[in-house]
Amino acid sequence: DQSINFYVKKNIDQNTRFFNKKNTFILNNFFFDQSHEVIFRSLSFLMKSVSGKYYVARGKSINDLIKKIKLNKISTKVTLGGCFVEKINETILISREKSSKT
């Protein structure tokens, strides 16, 4: 488990950028060159930190999202676990979904 966490941290450090003002992560295309487990855990961690929720989205939904990203099947914004996920050129943006509780 420690070795997987090492590669998850390494993947996040090397292949993502965080913009604090917009609470947004930008993932480059090398993010998805890792093993499936590393991608899954990295994406789960990023979505959990952006959305601010205690629980992350269901595993099956995250797996489906990873498949769509790898096959370039994301055409518009996708919402998952309180986050917007969208593909722009060769990068993926993960930002917080605006809540309607006002």
Question: At which residue positions do the language-model features occur?
Answer:
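AMP-forming adenylation/ATP pyrophosphatase catalytic core
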Residues: D1-T102
